[in-house]
Amino acid sequence: MADAAGLTGSAAETLAAKLRRAPLVLAIVVSPKPSPKVPDWEQEVVASGVAHALSLALDEAGWGVMWRTGLQARADAVHRIHQLAPNERLLGWLYVGAKPASKSGRRTPIKAKDYLTAL
């Protein structure tokens, strides 16, 4: 991963430590299949939705979950590490572990009208 990020020395060690923060790291990969009815982009959206649903299910089961992405997710070196086929794309990683003992504060509610529109 450090190679994919172009890091060396202490920066590479810092990245390696971050990758070991969670006891379980799941790679989220889309493997699109040729289909006249379901284009590649839609297959990627479905894979993302499945990963999100998995993160919600893990959270509901009491696990802490964080979806991580970054420039490394699309790097050739990372694709080699994950042994992805030429048509496969890494969408990111789900870091799974224990939840913090307590949440700090309460989230500020958002105003849905600031983010949604109607046709």
What do the predicted segments below correspond to?
Residues 26, 32-81:
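Small-aliphatic-rich amphipathic alpha-helix that forms the alpha element of a beta-alpha
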Residues 15, 80, 112-115:
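Glycine-rich, flexible loop/turn motifs
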Residues 1-47:
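Glycine/small-residue-rich phosphate/adenosyl-binding loop
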Residues 90-119:
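C-terminal helix-cap and adjacent tail motif
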Residues 10-13, 78-80, 103:
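Glycine-rich, charged/polar anion/phosphate-binding loops
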Residues 78-91:
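Short, electropositive alpha-helical surface patch
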Residues 22-24, 61, 90-92:
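Generic beta-strand structural signal
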